Amino acid sequence: RLIRRQRQMCIRDSFHMNLNEACTAVSYELPIITVIFNNSVLGMVRQWQTTFYEKRYSQTDPHRKTDFVKLADGFGLKGYRCTNLPEFQTAFADAMKQKGPTWIECIIDKDEKVLPMIPGGGDINDIIME
């Protein structure tokens, strides 16, 4: 039984590494909305290679295009795909009405950055904001 239905949480990680959690969410009909920011690459590694290694990209484009809406259907949950803010707003409003878990895939540019970031070996004084 889910006790605190109003709690919100944000987790940032590679979504492919957490697919197994969908099985639990579906099994227990947890009203969890997962927003997937899909840039079709290994974004954090690519960002580091852009910022610190003069765009010498290696192993950041897996050459696979996962269809997260079809994957959601395969897990037995509702999936949405958005390419702009109005689509996201519509999908999110509908997802809030669902009784079980939902995924909202947001297609973003492969060069979209996650900021702020701190370089390896750095501390808060080395923070990169743009």
Where are these regions (language model features)?
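Conserved thiamine diphosphate
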Residues: 50-91
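Glycine/aspartate-rich loop-and-adjacent alpha/beta segment that forms the canonical ThDP
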Residues: 85, 90-130
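Short glycine/serine/threonine-rich phosphate/pyrophosphate-binding segments
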Residues: 14-21
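A glycine-rich helix N-cap at a beta->alpha junction
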Residues: 27-44
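Active-site-proximal loop->helix
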Residues: 22-23, 44-52
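Single conserved hydrophobic/aromatic residue that forms the stacking wall/gate
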Residues: 1-11
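Short, hinge-like loop/turn segments at secondary-structure boundaries
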Residues: 26, 50-54, 98-99, 121-123
